[in-house]
Amino acid sequence: CNTAIECIDKLRDTMQSHERCSVVEVMGRRAGHLALQVGCAVGATAICLPERQLDFDTEIVERMRIGRIKGRNHHIIIVAEGYGSAQDVADQIHEATGIDTRVTILGHIQRGGSPSAMDRVMATRMGYAAVRALMEGKTNRVVVSDNNIVTDIDIEEGLAQSKDLNQCLFEAQQTVAI
């Protein structure tokens, strides 16, 4: 997440000075959690997630129009790779608004970068929980963090779980983005 945010912060400088729209594709083939986190952190105008289809005219074009009225001279649209083609989104934006729109696909660069302090602390906590489970004789377990509580669960239970999109965060981003 941090690497994507750093890249987008650098893109923002160019977008502002040239009054452009930047469509940025981030990882998320089957889930939009990363795209949502990144979009919130960078103040994206819109976030395209595989979990939900957008009404293009109201959730992108209209938001861009309102942003222009309020003085925003650039836009960042985050697209999770599972949503669809970032280039198609950019082409639709340019066609609907006439705004110069560029695509950046972050790809595997997102896998690199230094861990944050939170990442390092979480790794310590999860590593400790894994060793503790082994010392207790537990097998076929996976260490998880649920609401910042680290524990171990049966691996089959872990594999069967899915993580729902954070609707509250999505709604907050939709509200404050313009």
What is each PLM-predicted segment?
Residues R29, H33, H108, S114, ...:
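Gly/Ser/Thr-rich helix-start
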Residues Q92-I99, I109-T124, L134-M135:
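Catalytic, metal-anchored helix/loop core of enzyme active sites in primary metabolism
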Residues A86-D88, R111-S114, I149-D154:
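Short active-site-adjacent structural elements
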